[in-house]
């Protein structure tokens, strides 16, 4: 461990040689779809079904490059009538350096989507507004809780898969 001052900063001469870093190299829309099968309602409060998914994969170039994808889907309905369906796959190219092996997955599935989310949220709001509806403003997402939930589900699937093989 390094010595720290009262402010929590490393003392002079004790700076880490290679601190972990996360760089955003680019952000882009991979896929965007908006379907408006009906017309915008005049006074109907629609039921909104939201879906959020996060994925990450190493980039072909290597060098600590990863593509992180944030998928947002929204389906609005009033009764049995579908008002709109919006789907967005928004991605970023990130470079991780000097991140400990055990922290890479959490960095990719928590911190990277946290950086992408405000931009994806704005795109969803604009596309619903352009579709003739009030802008859909998605509440902030707790990516730590989402990561923990995905991690638990993966562990349960692995346990159930191994349990069935015995």
UniProtKB/Swiss-Prot annotation:
Keyword Ribosomal protein among record annotations: no
Alphabetical GO biological process terms: protein folding; protein tetramerization; protein transport
GO cellular component, one term: cytoplasm
Subcellular location: Cytoplasm
InterPro entries: SecB, SecB-like_sf
Keywords noted in UniProt: Chaperone, Cytoplasm, Protein transport, Translocation, Transport
Pfam families in the record: SecB
Bias (Polar residues) ranges: 1-16
Region spans: Disordered: 1-21
Annotated protein name in UniProt: Protein-export protein SecB
Gene: secB
